[in-house]
Amino acid sequence: MKELALKYGCNPNQKPARVFMEEGELPIEVLSGRPGYINLLDALNSWQLVKELKQATGLPAAASFKHVSPAGAAIGLPLDDTLKKIYFVDDVNFELTPLASAYARARGADRMCSYGDFCALSDVCDEATARLIKREVSDGVIAPGYTPEALIILREKRKGTYCVIQIDPAYTPAPIERKQVFGVTFEQGRNEVRLDDPSLFEDIPTKNKTFTPEAKRDLIIALITLKYTQSNSVCYVKDGQAIGIGAGQQSRIHCTRLAGSKADEWWLRQNPKVMNLPFKEKIRRADRDNCINLYIGDEAEDILSDGAWQQFFTEQPEPLTREERKAWIAKNTGVALGSDAFFPFGDNIERAHRSGVEFIAQAGGSIRDDHVIDTCDKYGIAMAFTHVRLFHH
C-alpha cells in the first residue's frame, strides 16, 4: 500500500488528509480500526522509541504516547506487588510476560496523561499484553506483529474500532527527512545518534563519578525517551521506566518541575495511605485515577469533603497531609535524570534532588556549567556531560 486516506488532519476542518510514500510502499498495515492523523504521528514516533529501547537494553519495551510525546516508556523488568497494585494489574489471573510488564509500566507511570493514549510495543504482541491493553481507554497500538490470540482480543476492543497497526520491523527510512510549514519545505538529516554509546558517559565533571550499571541503563532510557519528546523536555527514570516526563515547555526549569511533580506523584501512589484507599467496588478505573490524583495533591477536599467522599469510598479516608507527602517523597532515591539540552542554572539540580535524583545525563555547554556542577557536588550527584542535544519538533 502506497497511500492511506485519513478522515481528516489534526482537526476535523483540515481536509483532505492522507499519509503516503513518495517511493515504495508504506511500512505499516492497518489490521483493525481507522487511525487518524495524530494517531499515526504517535504511532510512528512511539515505534522508533521502543525499537531503540529494545536495541539498547536487549529487553522488550513499550511506550504510551499522547499528542506526539510519551507519557510513559519502559522496558520489561518484573513487577513487584506494589507496582502491580498501583498499575492496576494486581488482579489479573495470568502471568505477566516481559512485554506485558513493559506495557504495564509504560501505561501505569502517569495514568492521568495516558488516558486515551496510543501505545507502542517493541516485540510481537502476545496474549497477556493484549489482555492488559483491552482493559484501558486507548486509541490504538503499533507493534511488529501480533499472535493470533492477541489479534482476536484487540479486534474486539471498542466494538471493533480499536486501531491495530503492524509495522515492518526491518523498515529503514531515508537518511534525509522533509516536512512543510506554511508552504515552506524543511529538510534535515535524520537524528540517528546512538544513545547507548559508552562514550556519552565519559565526561564526568562532578566529584562523584560513579554510575552503577542500573543508573547507566536508566539514563539511556531517559535519553532515548527524550529523543522522541517535544522540546524542551526532561525525563526522570527509575528501575527501567520513565516515572516523570516534562514535555514541550519553553523554560528548562519548568520542564524539571513538571517532570519532578509527575515523579513525585508516581512515588506517592506507593504510600500505604494511597494504596489502601477504601474505594467502592466496581468504581471505574478513570475515576480511581482521578481520585488518587486529587488525594495526593492540594485539592483533596474535592473528594474528601462530606457529600463528595461517599461517591467513591466506603468510608471517609484520612487526608494525606503536606508533611506526610514531603516525608514520603524524601524516601525516594536512586532516580536518574536526563535532559534534552543543557541545564542553564543550578536551580534545576535543586529541584531534581528533591525528587530523589542521584544520576544525571545532560548535554553540558551552559555558561553556568560551573554552578550546575557545584550544585551536583553539594548533593553528591554524579553527572555526565553527553555533548549531545536531543531537541525534537
Go through each PLM region and give its residues.
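Gly-rich Lys/Arg/Thr-decorated short loops/hinges at beta-loop-alpha junctions or inter-strand turns
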Residues: 22-34, 109-115, 188-209, 286-309, ...
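Active-site-proximal loop/turn and secondary-structure-junction residues that shape catalytic pockets
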Residues: 69, 125, 238-241, 343, ...
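Bateman/CBS regulatory modules and CBS-like beta-alpha motifs in cytosolic regions of diverse proteins
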Residues: 124, 203-214, 343
